[in-house]
């Protein structure tokens, strides 16, 4: 894979300005392994200047470039930055890239026909490559228009070009990523399902575009209407659950989705104090668990040990069915991944099983969040829940990396490098999960690993095509670079491919005088490009050259006696000297070329995860080749130590910056939470009274000259309480986001640590301890512990559940304004008193039993200032209703003239209780009076104000 660009203009100028053959060759070599911007190939004048700058009659590599310039310029041509815009409108990016490549091809066609002609013949000739590029463009345009299949591209040398790989990557992302798999989904009979299950699957299949087979589902809006009107027991007020609202965001979200469907408005949103969806016995008994990942709110409740009113037997049975379904899903995924039907078919089948279970990329992200927020921590009341947790973790991780690989997949070397790195990250994260869930077989829900089951994503190198292309390269030197480039792009093993292919036909050797060979070797200077072919062909010359030049130069390089840039110059000379006189130095030259580019990658900070371990392997190969001539040869570790620090110190710095940023943020959060917790506790435990006439709360403020009264309107106080509690929630969200970033960084640390550990037994020794990655890992673990401890502390503060302390203020009123208006406008002769009963909202749930009351304290003036700093609404002032509001004009008695209203007291399931029950009853009576006064105090031109609680 190419890591950086070179300007064709700059290369051309350098070739024109230098005089030595070695310098010109060096520029060509540099261009050989770097990217060229496609926009430069659209500049006909620039391309012609480059071709005219190539030296004449130099033979070998430059001669091949001169006669095969279309191949040479296009093979490393890149379409970026257009290609890098792949996050924007996708079809537009594909069109831009195709247009750019088409312009470059047209420009080169013009050059070949008008100026340079199409010299030569064969697979890599200018004429054939231009023809193949035209065919490739036609194929890509047809795929983009959906008029041909992705897999219909015929084998062509063009598919190995960087520009073609970039277009293929875009096309595969566009066509594979959002496509519904063409597999049988085996949908159940929806008619036997309950309304909730039908609505869930109807919304899912219509949103994702999943076929439902022969069975038809009712419209999601109709089903939502049925849920809202006939299944009120599905919904529960957030103040009626035993955990704070933040621990049930998905139950809240599910209720919101139902109401959006009900209103047929995807933008609608229920209020903060709106209902949640709860678990029901009948649902858990009948839900089809093969759609497990559609029920995030159920997993959320079970993770928090919350079963609502469901029996333990029902929950246990539901969990057991979920375990069976997810185990089957794991088996199906393994079958989909191992079937030898080609990567596209593997992807189709694998994605089909994920979608059938409801495991879309979005749902995968939601379940990862749920696992992060999981509160059970292994302490659960349901025996099989830990097993379910492990299954969900493994399958969610698998789906996460499946979608990550799907975004990267194409049959290209670009995809191979990215997917290999992604699967290394998957292995690291899976290992972290295994360690977190304990040792032993139990911690592994499946026999397969994520890197193993997703290995079908790794594109295989087109070795047959590469071999044919290699056979069409006449220059041995160019052929060597071709295979080295293939090795770097496709991560080929040098011992299996390069060792066989980098063996050009040797020139016939000639007998030589040994003294002449030694004398000639002594006369050779670093930088010489000319050589005496008759001596270079001698059998003994290579051995003598290694002793007198190669080994001493390599000793100086590895001992760091030379500046690194000077060392690279000498290494480059070793590679290029007499390169077109095989078999001279062929055994040493192969690993030297690989070593050169690997060192260049490291010192240029073009970081690739495998760079350092590859560099060690190439160093070993170089040393082995040198030891054939100098058996006692050894290399100093100085260069390796330097490259180790260069390669990994930047990574360590990034890891340190991440953890330091986390510590700084967490420290700031802890300081702010301390103030927030104190203010929340102050309000929670303060004494106050309720002024029913003014609709205000009155707090006695302790002062030097006795108590003062701080009066605040109920809406302002509710806003204060809600804001303080929301601040707590925001802190938890901030901590979770920081923890997510820290976790991602920790996975990077795991991958790097694993790579370094794998090098400890390498035959090339160096100082592993110069960078303390183990200490860094310990620091990360301490940070995770700190985050968990702080989040737990925040969740246990009064401020975190402050609205529960003042729950009655946030509840809907027991009697609505419409009912009050009906009472005021009641006609003895026309109206039936029984109509009032339908307007009375009976409490729907059970308030948790009163907790033990703590000590109450009076607020101080400083407390008021502290509260106001965090919640500006905490300001003194009475309600907007006038104090002398118009009183009721009707006369009421305790009896009715005709029909009495008989309230069934047993239907009142809930009663909000305070410490003083008499005060509570007195307050409720006064509240009703206030509602009447407010109604009568408004004129018809000014509609009566409504408490938000009445409209929710």
Swiss-Prot record:
Entry keyword set: Host cytoplasm, Host Golgi apparatus, Host nucleus, Virion, Virion tegument
Pfam families: Herpes_U30
Subcellular location: Virion tegument; Host cytoplasm; Host nucleus; Host Golgi apparatus, Host trans-Golgi network
Name listed for the protein in its UniProt record: Inner tegument protein
Stretches of the chain forming a coiled coil according to its record: none
Region (Interaction with large tegument protein): 490-952
Main location: virion
Signal peptide: none
GO-annotated cellular components: host cell Golgi apparatus; host cell nucleus; viral tegument
Protein family (similarity comment): Belongs to the herpesviridae inner tegument protein family.
Function of the molecule: Plays an essential role in cytoplasmic secondary envelopment during viral egress. Interacts with the capsid via the large tegument protein/LTP and participates in its transport to the host trans-Golgi network (TGN) where secondary envelopment occurs. Modulates tegumentation and capsid accumulation at the viral assembly complex.
Residues that span the membrane, as ranges: none
